[in-house]
A protein has these predicted regions:
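Rhodanese-like catalytic fold shared by cysteine-dependent sulfurtransferases
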Residues: 8-49, 60-108
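Short hydrophobic beta-strand that contains or immediately precedes a catalytic carboxylate
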Residues: 1-5
Length: 108
């Protein structure tokens, strides 16, 4: 499992134990990480099955598309992401997502 969220998100929101971190974007302005594909290949390799996770599944979908186009044959997006979709009150962690499904996670 590769977490593509920013370092700040992982630190302040939580993370999946033993996940690998390769940020799709960096900082609070979410600037695209130009080294994403090289870092992903270095940390995981192109021949492995890769699950990508972000906050809601949107960035990880973009990352999965980019990785597939770059030759990562078995790359998948984790639907709903770590925090899930916004509910009718514009809040996450209420209706779906990794944490809502009570899957393992930690917070520093």
């Amino acid at each position: 499992l590769v977490d593509v969220r920013t370092s700040e998100e992982r630190k302040f929101v939580g993370y999946v134990p033993e996940s690998i971190h390769v940020a799709w974007a960096t900082g609070t302005s979410f600037n695209r990480n130009p080294r994403f594909l090289k870092e992903l290949e270095s940390k995981v390799g192109k021949d492995k099955t890769i699950l990508l996770l972000c906050r809601s599944g949107k960035r990880s979908a973009l990352a999965a598309t980019a990785a597939f186009s770059a030759g990562f044959a078995q790359v998948y997006n984790v639907l709903e992401g770590f925090e899930g979709d916004l509910n009718e009150l514009q809040q996450r962690n209420q209706s779906n997502g990794w944490r809502t499904h009570q899957l393992p996670w930690l917070q520093d």
